[in-house]
UniProtKB/Swiss-Prot annotation:
Natural source organism: Salinibacter ruber (strain DSM 13855 / M31)
Enzyme kind, highest EC tier: translocase
Gene encoding the protein: hmuV
Classification via Pfam families: ABC_tran (PF00005)
UniProt-listed SMART domains: AAA
Protein name (record): Hemin import ATP-binding protein HmuV
Organism classification: Bacteria, Pseudomonadati, Rhodothermota, Rhodothermia, Rhodothermales
Amino acid sequence: MIALRDITVHIGDATLIERVSAAVRPGQMTAVVGPNGAGKTTLLRVASGELTPSEGAVQLDDRPLAALSEQAQARRRAVLPQASRLHFAFSVLEVVLMGRTPHVQGREGPEDWAIAEDALDAVAMAGFADRDVPTLSGGEQQRVHLARALAQIWTPPDDGHRYLLLDEPTASLDLAHQQNVLRTARAFADQGAGVLAILHDLNLAAQFADHVVVMADGGVHAQGAPASVLTPPCIREVFGWPVCVLAHPTQSCPLIVPDGAEAGATVSDPNSL
């Protein structure tokens, strides 16, 4: 488990997050939601080891994260950042092989190549191995970088677990690519990995996550199972907009619908547009 306890981050005179506690548990997918500026990415950067907290403690599988070498951390957790655009003509397979760097001494071996190919297959990109990454669509590129992250932690360590940290993995993706990316992450969690995903779409969080952390103003407003925290009062208080929460017609998760009428919103006559 990645355990974050009473995390506070100060940058200059600004406090980005304050006394935040959360966890990424093996076999579960945790979604972090909240309005812009709530501190979601800061929390992920602390969980990944990229950012050292001003106060609080971070542990990875019951050991202080800072006590692990960068290589040891990289063999246990992989990060998919918000922006992963690549402008150089690397092939898809070359990019995915970069994920094997923490495991390689010298050149990649047959096992590394096999893992890279398996990771591409996991994100439904097996037929793209020889394509240059800049020639792919944005959604295809995102899946390639997800495959790179999966390849990095493909095999569980002997003395711990794997963790996949995703910072807005569905941003700017169409419906099909959003579902493909999060279904892949969900499957990875079902295989025993811990997954942390920052999401803006509350319905995606409700659909895929086991646990939801709702952040606001640099702190945790609520956390728990999707149905227990993605409620009309919580959403209205955090996001400043009323919603209706319905039973999903085909899945066992909440369905969140913005309530424009309750907010006093007006609908334009479509004939006047």
